Amino acid sequence: MRRPILRNLFLASGLLALTQLTIPTQAAAEARLALVIGQSAYRTVPELPNAANDAKGMTELLGNAGFTVTTASNLAQNDMRQAISDFAGKVSASGADTVALVFYAGHGLQIDGENYLVPVDLDPKREADIPLQGVRLNDLLNTLGALPTRARIFMLDACRNNPFPALSGAGHGLAIVDTKAGAQGTFISYSTSPGAEAEDGTGIDSPYTTAALTVAKQPNLPIEEVFKRIRVAVAQSTDGRQIPWESSSLTTDFKFFGGDSSGSQAALPGASSMALASGTRSLEDWRKDLQGKPAMIAYEMVITDDRSDSVS
């Protein structure tokens, strides 16, 4: 009884090593890094409770999609700039095959066509204070745009109502940035159309994030299709009051999730279910099935199969 187990353990170890050499994983070919910012606890204007929930939900979704996620909440101006700088450093160190994604939920403003993300400590007394106290969206875009990456994705749920109505020059919503005028490989999604306001929502998440959390986890959807479906879902849930908008200069394909499941790309079938079909599995099938499996799961698959001819 001992020899088949030892033989199969050797097979599992050998196939794992062979698989790593001959069939590179998607994780090895494409690093995924994300920065998620949720701004709820504003100090001088009413809070946005859903922004924190939005960030929490997106952190979970992106983690399941294979991203290494950095989550930051309720950032003052200096902290937000530092978070962006630190994230850019991680992206730079990760290399040119990296997909970098930034999700921002919170207030956003535009002044003279320039967009600003709003730190929780922003307290302008006049319009001229906003460029000094805010964080320019273009600074974020340019910082990541200067780095060699496979793709840069920005999701901006930042077009909520103007938190400073006394400043008449602070425009409603955000101005659309044309990605085609900047670095290639950039995709920007706005939670609503140019100059319009986005709703915070009456549920635990905003309408935009609610749609994103549902649609983005569907398997095998190209990013363009994902955000088209998000647009349709948000328009329906808000009776047409809010229409998400995108600008893209992507030159490569991207899917949040591959495969046939709505879970993580790493959430492959377990050893027990894989073993059910092992009687007709070829060596090439073994290589594919063992791809990316932890050693103990691969071992269980092999000993469950327990076919002596599998080493012939």
Language-model-detected regions and their locations in the chain:
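Cysteine endopeptidase catalytic domains of the caspase/legumain-like
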Residues: 2-311
